[in-house]
Amino acid sequence: MPDLKNLVEKEMLELVHSDLGYFTLCLFAPFVEETVFRGAVLRTLLPRMKSRWAAIAISAALFSLVHLNPAQMPFAFIAGLLLGWLYSRTGSILPGVAYHWVNNTVVFAMARLLPPQIINGHLIDLFGGDHRRMVLSVIFSLFIFLPAIYQLNIRMRKA
């Protein structure tokens, strides 16, 4: 039986470096995935479940499972929660498609531009092995991300 993790990684790397890679991963995939997981799955679950967050969590779990790569699943689940929240707040898949496009484009660019040892390594490798710099960067990112989500939530309540 083939090693699924290595097979998925190999297929993704080949796709990133192919002529259709950007179209497939950054334009087509976000539209299709948002249509399926937010436009169909979440839209169906929201009116049928008592808890909005339970519906969002189920669609996020399905979204993460479809990515097939165990290393991607935790991030895909968290992204699925954010995308589900965006859909539940706006009733539209378009904000999710935009977020998904930006995310996939950044990952695509990193895969094309950064050396393979960085791409195949760990987060700490991006910081030259310096744990302090990595932790400070993550904390700094959270200081930007969390207030941004809070402000977005406030502004969406007013709308």
Question: Where would I find each of the regions flagged by the language model?
Answer:
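Juxtamembrane helix-loop-helix connectors linking adjacent transmembrane helices
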Residues: 1-35, 42-48, 121-126
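Hydrophobic residues within alpha-helical transmembrane segments
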Residues: 28, 58-62, 74, 98, ...
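Residues that define the loop-to-transmembrane-helix transition and helix capping
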Residues: 20, 53-54, 71, 93-94
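Membrane-interface helix/loop boundary segments of multi-pass membrane proteins
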Residues: 32-58, 85-92
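Hydrophobic, membrane-inserted alpha-helices
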Residues: 56-63, 78-82
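C-terminal membrane module of polytopic membrane proteins
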Residues: 101-159
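Active-site His/Glu-centered metal-binding helix of metallohydrolases
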Residues: 31-36, 40-41, 69, 102-106
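Membrane-interface helix caps and helix-loop-helix hairpins in membrane proteins
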Residues: 65-71
